[in-house]
A protein has these predicted regions:
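Intracellular juxtamembrane helix-capping segments at the cytosolic ends
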Residues: 12-26, 246-262
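Glycine-rich segments within core transmembrane alpha-helices of 12-TM secondary carriers
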Residues: 31-65, 72-79, 270-284
Length: 362
């Protein structure tokens, strides 16, 4: 029951945080910010190993409590303290943040409206969540990104079993195993953040995501081919970590800068993509059964299949958005020769955004 309650309150945090960032930053700024949020997972994985190693080796029996109990107490208290602080220091949306002046609110909303190609800097009219759900569900791009996120989450499933994979190197001491889990995540943190910076600076998304996906596939293929070499396996895990988290740190920024109008549609699209990603967590854990020890070739083979699916999604989204941008140019410059069926598929907000110069980031 405790785990059920924990999952219930945790579930909305990540998509809510993604949507929150998209309500403050333009598409030229959001990549690095979202990468920092997502790279928090990498830092938590890296330092959780270090913290766990220290607690498990040094606090067993303190206060007549087992070390694993201290692990939950310390990490739980840290989360609680940060959550309470966030209640007071985290701003609300640009239109409702109390400590912003009216002029600052208009500026904050205006820069986002201009970025999305909208004329209005005022609060949008309240739209029912059901309407946003219908809009998002009928948009093929929502499901392209949802499929990409599902494939990426399945590819990251190895991280849940990384300590077990490290044990296959021959280490029996749990402290040593936990310490060895940190370096791949720290390197992946630098990789993901660097590519997010490049993506923002160059206003590209598919190329960084595609390069990271290819790197993950190379690492996975090498793990399958040279799985008997223990330290080679550890080295190749760096490639997989960099690649998979490099994709993960890029795609949510890509989604939020693609489905921009209206905001309720963006919120639902982010939620649907995150839901599909969580579905992957349900089945991907079964890739790592004990019967696949010690090389886990079948497990890595499953990951390779989902990485290939992710790469195909990246290429499909790139092709779809590039073709849409070409049609947008026609709509802006030569509306009289524009495909009328294409125009009908755009809602009023999207049509206005296109005429104001909005283009997808590819």
């Amino acid at each position: 029951m405790v785990r059920l309650f924990l999952g219930f309150v945790e579930a909305p945090f990540f998509p809510g945080a993604i949507y929150f960032l998209s309500c403050w930053y333009t598409k030229r700024e959001i990549g690095v910010r979202m990468a920092l949020l997502i790279c928090g997972i990498l830092l938590s994985n890296a330092f959780a190993g270090l913290i766990s190693a220290g607690i498990l080796s040094g606090m067993n029996g303190v206060g007549n409590l087992a070390s694993w109990r201290w692990l939950f107490i310390i990490e739980g208290l840290a989360t609680l303290v940060v959550g309470v602080i966030a209640l007071f220091v985290l701003p609300d949306f640009p239109s409702t943040t109390k400590w912003l002046t009216q002029e600052e609110k208009v500026i904050a909303q205006g820069r986002l409206a201009a970025d999305a190609g909208s004329d209005s800097v005022l609060d949008e009219e309240k739209v029912p969540i059901t309407r946003g759900l219908i809009w998002a569900a009928k948009d093929p791009r929502t499901w392209m990104f949802a499929c990409l996120q599902m494939a990426t989450t399945a590819s990251i499933s190895y991280s849940h079993f990384f300590p077990t994979l490290i044990k296959q190197l021959g280490f029996k001491n749990n402290t040593t195993v936990l310490l060895l889990t940190s370096p791949p995540y720290l390197v992946a943190f630098c990789w993901a953040l660097s590519w997010a910076w490049v993506a923002d600076r160059r206003q590209i998304r598919s190329i960084p995501a595609g390069i990271s996906q290819c790197l993950a596939m190379v690492g996975t293929i090498l793990l399958i081919a040279i799985g008997d070499s223990l330290w080679a396996r550890y080295g190749f895990s760096f490639l997989v970590a960099c690649g998979t988290f490099g994709v993960y740190a890029t795609t949510y920024a890509w989604l939020s800068s693609t489905i921009t109008q209206p905001p309720i549609k963006r919120a639902v699209a982010i939620g649907l993509a995150n839901t599909c990603a969580n579905i992957a967590s349900l089945f991907a854990n079964y890739f790592w059964l004990d019967q696949y020890e010690p090389a886990y070739r079948q497990s890595w083979g499953c990951l390779l299949a989902f990485q290939a699916l992710g790469l195909s999604c990246i290429l499909t989204i790139r092709f779809t958005l590039k073709r849409a941008n070409k049609k947008f140019e026609s709509l802006s410059n030569e509306a009289d020769v524009m495909d009328p069926l294409f125009i009908e598929r755009l809602n009023a907000d999207e049509r206005k955004a296109v005429q104001n110069g909005f283009r997808y980031i590819v």
